[in-house]
């Protein structure tokens, strides 16, 4: 039988929790090492399932990968394999981020269409269009993205939407293209900035990271480097929301609060006291949270990854909240599980209207993705009795030491077979 969590509600969470490296950053950094022959070292890697999965992807492409605690040492060969059509690639979404580096380094790639979280359509149209503008052919053939180029040349690329994945794949091909590439409407997420920082350390010439317009001057080759992953803002915010929901007092370290300003402002609006330093923040909630409206948007807006936690918070807030999802269309299936817990919520697929109740009621629930799983656990913390959360392998893909950290903060939670 698959593992599950049993969460006993009613405890106030308090204490300090340290956040590790960002899941949404480390996997792309690992892929970027393919661009330079030799050994690169990435530190502050989170202890999550997706890191060894990405290591398997890189090994399948000819790299040597050593994982030691929070350190990944990746040796990229002089001629990486370009065919990424094997089981590890199909297991999770981020594996598609090897497309850009392979096209850049090998001038060809064959990458199996990836799996990952069940949160709606995430087409690769913009990835393909961007690579075509750089001079590559790029098509879907027999379940794989197949790309090839004689020469990559810089281009003016206008993204329809500031897609993180498309920005990163185009970026990692453009850094070794001839001439100058400009990406308009580029993603501004801290994870993209982190990737640009590492690429520049490798010898790339990327300007404008964190702004809507990114300029890349291609260079003939890149070199290995050492880089520290930024702290995980999504994990950090999850702990902040947990403090607000349980009327707790949690200090979160190892993350830049500048990456979370819209979230911290929403917690303040919900009645929490929020204090910040350069690399930490503290959330204290004394009363029942107030209802707040949330609309997900690309950075610097409210992250779509935190939408389930926003719904969980709204479910026990004083008043009615509207949560609007503007990024992934299928993310509201989480609401069905919240209704099992007694939440008063309804959705039309784009909005969720949630009328807060003083308390939820325990029930068996099932995770559909990483963040929905975390949201269900937070809901279990404020439900009466024991809530069983199933399919928790999703949570393990994105939250290091999740049960251990919750227990340290005072939650009553256990992992059972």
Curated annotation (Swiss-Prot):
Pathway where it operates: Cell wall biogenesis; peptidoglycan biosynthesis
Keyword Cell wall biogenesis/degradation: yes
Keyword presence, Cell cycle: yes
Gene Ontology MF terms: UDP-N-acetylglucosamine 1-carboxyvinyltransferase activity
Residues annotated as binding UDP-N-acetyl-alpha-D-glucosamine: 93, 305, 327
Record localization: Cytoplasm
Alphabetized UniProt keyword annotations: Cell cycle, Cell division, Cell shape, Cell wall biogenesis/degradation, Cytoplasm, Peptidoglycan synthesis, Transferase
Pfam families: EPSP_synthase
Listed GO CC annotations: cytoplasm
A GO biological process held by the record: cell division
First-tier enzyme category under EC: transferase
Positions annotated as active site in the UniProt record: 117
Tree of life domain: Bacteria
EC number: 2.5.1.7
Residues making up the signal peptide according to the UniProt record: none
Membership in a protein family: Belongs to the EPSP synthase family. MurA subfamily.
Protein name: UDP-N-acetylglucosamine 1-carboxyvinyltransferase
């Amino acid at each position: 039988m698959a593992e599950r969590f049993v969460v006993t509600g009613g405890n106030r969470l308090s204490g300090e929790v340290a956040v590790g490296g960002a899941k949404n950053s480390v996997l792309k950094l690992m892929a970027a090492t393919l661009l330079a022959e030799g050994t690169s070292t990435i530190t502050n890697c989170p202890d999550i399932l997706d890191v060894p999965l990405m290591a398997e992807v890189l090994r399948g492409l000819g790299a040597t990968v050593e994982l030691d605690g929070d350190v990944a040492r990746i040796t990229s060969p002089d001629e990486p394999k370009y065919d990424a059509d094997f089981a590890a690639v199909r297991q999770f979404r981020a594996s598609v981020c090897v497309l850009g580096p392979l096209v850049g380094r090998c001038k060809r790639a064959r990458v199996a269409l990836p799996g990952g979280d069940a949160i709606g359509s995430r087409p690769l149209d913009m990835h393909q269009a961007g690579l075509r503008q750089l001079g590559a052919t790029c098509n879907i053939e027999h379940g794989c993205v197949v790309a090839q180029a004689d020469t990559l040349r810089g281009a003016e690329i206008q993204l329809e939407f500031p897609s993180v994945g498309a920005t990163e794949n185009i970026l990692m091909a453009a850094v070794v293209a001839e001439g100058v590439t400009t990406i308009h409407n580029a993603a501004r997420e801290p994870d993209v900035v982190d990737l640009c920082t590492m690429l520049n350390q490798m010898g790339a010439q990327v300007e404008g990271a964190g702004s809507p317009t990114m300029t890349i001057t291609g260079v003939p080759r890149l070199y290995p480097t050492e880089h520290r992953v930024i702290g995980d803002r999504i994990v950090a915010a999850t702990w902040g929301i947990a403090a607000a929901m349980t009327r707790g007092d949690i200090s979160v370290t190892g993350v830049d609060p500048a990456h979370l300003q819209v979230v911290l402002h929403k917690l303040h609006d919900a009645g929490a006291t929020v204090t910040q330093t350069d690399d930490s923040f503290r959330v204290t909630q004394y009363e029942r949270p107030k209802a707040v409206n949330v609309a997900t948007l690309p950075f610097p807006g409210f992250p779509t990854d935190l939408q389930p936690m926003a719904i969980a918070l709204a479910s026990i807030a004083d008043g009615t909240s509207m949560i609007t999802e503007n990024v992934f269309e299928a993310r509201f299936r989480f609401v069905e599980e919240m209704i099992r817990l007694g939440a008063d919520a309804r959705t039309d697929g784009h909005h969720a209207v949630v009328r807060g109740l003083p308390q939820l009621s325990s029930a068996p629930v099932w995770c559909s993705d990483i963040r929905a799983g975390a949201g269900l656990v937070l809901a279990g913390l404020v439900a009466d009795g024991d809530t069983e959360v199933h399919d928790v392998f999703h949570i393990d893909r994105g939250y290091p030491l999740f049960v251990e950290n919750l227990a340290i903060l005072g939650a009553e939670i256990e992992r059972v077979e």
